[in-house]
UniProtKB/Swiss-Prot annotation:
Keywords: Carbohydrate metabolism, Glucose metabolism, NADP, Oxidoreductase. Homodimer. The active site is at 243 (proton acceptor). It catalyses: D-glucose 6-phosphate + NADP(+) = 6-phospho-D-glucono-1,5-lactone + NADPH + H(+). Belongs to the glucose-6-phosphate dehydrogenase family. Its EC number is 1.1.1.49. The keyword NADP applies. Signal peptide: none annotated. One of its GO terms (biological process) is pentose-phosphate shunt, oxidative branch. This is Glucose-6-phosphate 1-dehydrogenase. It comes from Gluconobacter oxydans (strain 621H). Catalyzes the oxidation of glucose 6-phosphate to 6-phosphogluconolactone. One of its GO terms (cellular component) is cytosol. The lineage of its organism: Bacteria, Pseudomonadati, Pseudomonadota, Alphaproteobacteria, Acetobacterales. Pathway: Carbohydrate degradation; pentose phosphate pathway; D-ribulose 5-phosphate from D-glucose 6-phosphate (oxidative stage): step 1/3.
């Protein structure tokens, strides 16, 4: 088994420790890092939630979560017991004062006062401020404390500002880690390597050579048990305001001075500030929103969004946007962003289409080169090139794909994106986390779109579950001579 560099001893306190995120992602991620030798023996993981449990009952839940969400072949009994031995639990209403905070304080007091302490807020964002207030009241914030904030950071600029102010009152910005798990994905991080470590790509990475960029994240599942939450969010808030805009930033940003956190985040911020505003006047031509209706997904009949929700709604389950980055590098290059529930397939990818070669020596204009960075389900890179069609008597062209799977040495599977990010917070490395001004710049661009939709400037469309979206989304690209990636395969 390959071992990675071990981090220093730490205390990880997870608020919302009985919730789905903790059980499905956080505990399995931490277990995997222990399995790879990165978590020291004296590390402590403390769960905190309102559910009345003792330590034994919480450990039993954690064991069930590991067995449910991880492959059985990596659950060695000795490793599982070593991991569970690091767990503790406190019954705690994080929004209120009370003696249960003293119980948490007692657990943390067992360690040296200068030990790294990470508070992970896997709770509703409206609780972030009160949790920080209580951490301060009970003197649990130390110079080596960090706080990890899950999305969404607000539902608009006002609520995002309130959340950031509430946390910032007690934690300086350098101790705040706003997590976006997309930035923990290997293919997303590889955007920087492909661009800046390969002169072949770097020289062609501008509007002079690139015709369009598509950023897609669609899935086959519906809202299912999250209907009440999702109806207050929608596709634009849930995916584009955070994950997909971050991906766009990595594709479009100028080369940072270094890979230091602020250098990278400054470069991303410049992209967000350069996004052309979408207003009431342009929403109809630059955006499409839609809801799925009943259809067939993976051979099964599924209900429409309104049927699942059980009431009328103006919340979109599909969003497509044609964005423009108003910098010299990206003049006249459209960035197409889309996300959807109940799509015909599950895929997240970046598609870069290059301008065709300006030559007629082969009789017809060669097909455009196309670079596809697959984020999920199978991470990898495809590059479509023009090659000679094998024949003895003619010199015709055909396209051929160079397909590269990005694999770890030794054939190990990629770590889940949370695995890297959880330990980056321990290391104090914020490069893959979001700075406050990035969050607010993203909201400045997204909020006018939400307002335009609220005023019905881009009418709500529909699409059948199991399809690739409404016809209007196809027209969004066709008006610029483009097609969505799956239509060209």
């Amino acid at each position: 088994m390959e071992h990675f560099q071990q981090v220093e001893p730490f205390d990880y306190v997870i608020f919302g420790a009985t919730g789905d995120l903790t059980m499905r992602k956080l505990l399995p991620a931490l277990y995997n890092r222990l399995r790879m030798g990165q978590i020291p023996d004296d590390a402590c993981i403390i769960g905190a939630a309102r559910t009345e449990l003792d330590r034994e009952a919480y450990v039993a839940r954690a064991r069930d979560a590991l067995e449910r969400f991880l492959p059985s072949d990596i659950l060695g009994p000795g490793l599982v017991e070593r991991f569970l031995a690091r767990l503790d639990y406190v019954t705690l209403d994080s929004s209120r004062e009370g003696p249960q905070w003293d119980a948490l304080k007692s657990l943390l007091a067992k360690a040296q006062p200068d030990r790294v302490r990470v508070y992970y807020f896997a709770t509703a964002p409206q609780l972030y401020g009160s949790i920080c207030e209580n951490l301060n009241r009970y003197e649990l914030i130390t110079p080596t404390s960090r706080v990890v904030l899950e999305k969404p950071i607000g539902t608009n600029m006002a609520t995002a500002t309130a959340i950031n102010d509430g946390v910032g009152q007690y934690f300086p910005e350098k101790q705040i880690y706003r997590i976006d798990h997309y930035l923990g994905k290997e293919t997303v991080q590889n955007v920087l390597a492909l661009r800046f470590a390969n002169p072949l790509m770097n020289a062609a990475w501008s509007g002079e050579h690139i015709e369009s960029v598509q950023i897609t994240a669609v899935e086959t599942v519906g809202v299912e048990g999250r209907a009440a939450y999702y109806d207050t969010s929608g596709a634009l808030r849930d995916m584009i305001q955070n994950h997909l805009l971050q991906v766009l930033c990595l594709v479009a940003m100028e080369a940072p001075d270094s890979l230091e956190a602020d250098a990278v985040r400054n470069a991303k911020l410049a992209v967000l500030n350069a996004l052309r505003p979408i207003t009431d006047a342009t929403a109809a031509t630059e955006t499409v929103r839609a809801q799925y209706t009943a259809g067939v997904v993976d051979g099964e009949n599924v209900p429409g969004y309104l049927e699942e929700l059980g009431k009328p709604s103006a919340t979109e389950t599909y969003a497509a946007i044609r964005a423009w980055v108003d910098t010299p590098r990206w003049k006249n290059v459209p960035f197409y962003i889309r996300t959807a529930k109940r799509s015909g397939k599950k895929v997240s990818e970046i598609v870069v289409t290059f301008r065709p070669a300006a030559t007629t020596m082969f009789g017809a204009t060669p097909a455009s080169n196309r670079l596809v960075l697959r984020i999920q389900p199978n991470e990898g890179v495809d590059l479509r090139l023009n090659v000679k069609n094998p024949a003895l008597d003619v010199f015709n062209l055909r396209t051929a794909d160079l397909d590269t799977s990005i694999r770890m040495e030794g054939g190990l599977p990629f770590p889940d994106s949370y695995e890297r990010l959880l330990l980056d917070a321990v290391r104090g490395d914020p490069v893959l986390f979001i700075r406050r001004d990035e969050v607010e710049a993203a909201w400045r661009w997204v909020e006018p779109i939400l307002e335009a939709w609220k005023h019905d400037k881009a009418p709500m469309q529909t699409y059948s579950a199991g399809s690739y979206g409404p016809e209007q989304a196809t027209q969004l690209l066709a008006s610029h001579g483009d097609t969505w990636h799956e239509a060209s395969e």
